[in-house]
């Protein structure tokens, strides 16, 4: 959407510069041309990037994505290196959700302040747009995604977890076919196949290199991907139907998810053991957890800005490059075994991601392939047969 908006602004400006006649005396035309030349608004929290050129917007968004998500991955892995913390991945999720509630509330007040022009602390956030029953479903899916993803680090290497996250297309493709009845082209299926092959190879290499490899971690991160795939479909439908801002979706999803998880941990008794452990290591848990949550929350804002300014395919390419850099940093900063199979299987996954991005710009269908095969067969049938005469 952002790519289309940026393109329309460039085309309008170009046509206006090439045609001088219509901009003469008509106030209507003058008003239209001045309003059409306004670029689409691009904000990251309270920072306005609207009046920067598209290249500057892209570079700032890329820098934010790389810096914040590399910091996010580093802090996440660092927290799990604390001795004895691995069983408390769900408590880390509870802490993260609590911080996200505070960040979301501040962002909603900032949005209301910008629109109402009143004091920041006297302004009230906009009323809720999406029905509560939808948020109850979104909160459960968000809890499954974040909780299972965090907890899987107790059983998997961080690079393996990131590789699994790169393969989100697989459950998204299957879920949208079964739930929404969408149709996909051959490039999408080729991308999913590459991801499956690379993922299986990477997991096999990890099971051979890591002595504490546990299939429970694979099950957890797979469950997180399934929840993440369902979130995309539910969020997209709800935001289109009710015109809800992203800050509202984040606030209610994580707020209700916090309530879910808090009740579950109270009933199971895991809350008190996790809280006691974190009180013994406040800096490594609550302190690093704050920076971990803040970098993740701000990273979401930069990704959304990148989508608006450069389009979803470019954003997907940037986030994929970010994940590759994160994996490299993980091997450099944290000691872990390495094998060349990690590299080759990772490249196969990257190929799948590239095919997925390429398919967004080139809508190749199975009908196109069949028609091309028919044309090729027709040309072969019409080509004159060559006779080779051998004279003796």
From Swiss-Prot:
Region (Disordered): 11-35
Lineage: Eukaryota, Metazoa, Ecdysozoa, Arthropoda, Hexapoda
Top-level taxon in the UniProt lineage: Eukaryota
Disulfide linkage: none
Gene of this entry: Papst2
Subcellular location: Golgi apparatus membrane
Any one GO MF annotation of this record: 3'-phosphoadenosine 5'-phosphosulfate transmembrane transporter activity
Function as written in the Swiss-Prot or TrEMBL entry: Mediates the transport of adenosine 3'-phospho 5'-phosphosulfate (PAPS), from cytosol into Golgi. PAPS is a universal sulfuryl donor for sulfation events that take place in the Golgi. Essential for viability. Involved in glycosaminoglycan synthesis and the subsequent signaling. May be involved in hh and dpp signaling by controlling the sulfation of heparan sulfate (HS).
Membrane topology: Multi-pass membrane protein
Major localization class: Golgi
Keywords: Developmental protein, Golgi apparatus, Membrane, Transmembrane, Transmembrane helix, Transport
Coiled-coil annotated spans: none
Family affiliation: Belongs to the nucleotide-sugar transporter family. SLC35B subfamily.
Gene Ontology cellular-component annotations: endoplasmic reticulum membrane; Golgi apparatus; Golgi membrane
TM ranges: 62-82, 87-107, 136-156, 159-179, 185-205, 212-232, 249-269, 286-306, 314-334, 338-358
Single Gene Ontology BP annotation: 3'-phosphoadenosine 5'-phosphosulfate transport
Protein name per the record: Adenosine 3'-phospho 5'-phosphosulfate transporter 2
Presence of keyword Isomerase: no
């Amino acid at each position: 959407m952002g790519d289309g908006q940026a393109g329309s602004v460039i085309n309008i400006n170009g046509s206006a510069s090439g045609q001088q006649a219509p901009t003469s005396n008509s106030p209507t035309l003058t008003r239209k041309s001045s309003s059409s030349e306004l670029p689409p608004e691009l904000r990251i929290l309270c920072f306005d990037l609207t009046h920067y050129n598209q290249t500057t917007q892209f570079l700032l968004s890329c820098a934010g994505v790389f810096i914040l998500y590399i910091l996010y991955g580093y802090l996440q892995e660092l927290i799990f290196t604390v001795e004895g913390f691995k069983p408390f991945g769900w408590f880390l999720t509870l802490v993260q959700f609590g911080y996200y509630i505070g960040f979301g509330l501040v962002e909603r007040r900032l949005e209301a302040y910008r629109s109402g022009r009143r004091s920041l602390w006297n302004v009230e956030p906009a009323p809720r747009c999406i029905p509560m029953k939808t948020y109850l479903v979104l909160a459960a899916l968000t809890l499954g995604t974040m909780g299972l993803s965090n907890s899987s680090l107790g059983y998997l290497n961080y690079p393996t977890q990131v590789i699994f996250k790169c393969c989100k297309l697989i459950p998204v493709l299957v879920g949208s076919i079964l739930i929404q009845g969408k149709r996909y082209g051959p490039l999408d299926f080729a991308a999913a196949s590459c991801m499956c092959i690379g993922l299986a190879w990477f997991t096999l290499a990890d099971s051979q290199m890591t002595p504490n490899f546990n299939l429970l971690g694979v099950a957890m991160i797979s469950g997180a991907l399934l929840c993440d795939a369902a979130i995309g479909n539910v969020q997209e439908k709800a935001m289109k139907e009710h015109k809800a801002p992203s800050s509202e979706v984040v606030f209610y999803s994580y707020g209700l998810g916090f309530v879910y998880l808090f009740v579950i941990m109270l009933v199971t008794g895991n809350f008190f053991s996790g809280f006691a452990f974190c009180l013994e290591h406040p800096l490594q848990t609550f302190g690093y957890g704050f920076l971990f949550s803040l970098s993740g929350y701000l990273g979401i804002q930069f990704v959304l800005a990148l989508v608006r300014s450069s389009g979803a395919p470019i954003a997907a390419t940037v986030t994929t490059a970010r994940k590759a850099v994160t994996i490299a940093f993980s091997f450099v900063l944290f000691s872990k075994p390495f094998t060349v199979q990690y590299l080759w299987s990772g490249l196969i996954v990257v190929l799948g991601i590239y095919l997925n991005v390429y398919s967004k710009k080139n809508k190749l269908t199975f009908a196109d392939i069949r028609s091309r095969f028919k044309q090729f067969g027709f040309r072969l049938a019409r080509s004159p047969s060559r006779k080779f005469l051998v004279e003796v």
